[in-house]
């Protein structure tokens, strides 16, 4: 009987480098031989394993996703559009970079240094609606934020999409460390498409957090009704018995309007 194999300890400088070394040396060849990417997630690239933590933002149109990102970043960013109507019609990855410009989807998915090469499988219709927004700030130095199109209320509005919205959201969710689901506190509703998206993300339920945005104009009584209504709506969609952690405030650079709840909402912002 031969002696068991012994391996010299790997000299890795970080946990990310250790994961990359172990995945490349022991897992990737097995996945490739077993055609793992044909029936589940695609093979991971070096850039994906070494990428910064990712946060995915989802919500119906005009829920304040883009303003939320601007509030966190502290400045405008490339490809930013804010307005009462559905303004964000594509996916944007806010990342650290010196160019201060928006990199189109085709170029973004061609770069080996970016963790988005696998997105090319969704076709040119999606790539035309995807970009990387490079911005230097404290936020992007620590993580990557994914802004998404507003989820629309009716099926007719979604018929014009030439790409699989649910599949793309699922791809980002699989690689995200946190998923923020934003609601406008003035118009709580769960559309059919939003229900479909939440059901798609059941496997990533532990990553999800709720944000009730634009809440500073509401009274204490109204906030209680809004919170109760939101939990009632989502209770019919989420399958887990636990209540999701929720944050309630107005995430923009304007002063809070309700002095009675200013302290509470300031703490929620932090």
Residue ranges and their predicted role:
Residues 200, 204, 208-209, 214-270:
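Canonical P-loop GTPase G-domain recognition
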Residues 99-101, 150-152, 186-188, 215-218, ...:
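Conserved nucleotide-binding/hydrolysis micro-motifs of P-loop NTPases
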Residues 23, 27-31, 76-77, 180, ...:
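Eukaryotic basic, amphipathic alpha-helical target segments in cytosolic regions
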Residues 1-154:
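Conserved G1/Walker A P-loop phosphate-binding module
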Residues 134-186, 197-211:
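Inter-motif core of Ras-like GTPase G domains
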Residues 35, 69-74, 84, 106-109, ...:
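Short coil/turn segments at secondary-structure boundaries
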Residues 18, 68-72, 175, 193-197, ...:
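Alpha-helical scaffold elements adjacent to nucleotide-binding pockets in ATP/GTP-utilizing enzyme cores
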Residues 10-14, 50, 63, 67, ...:
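Charged, alpha-helix-enriched surfaces in structured cytosolic catalytic cores
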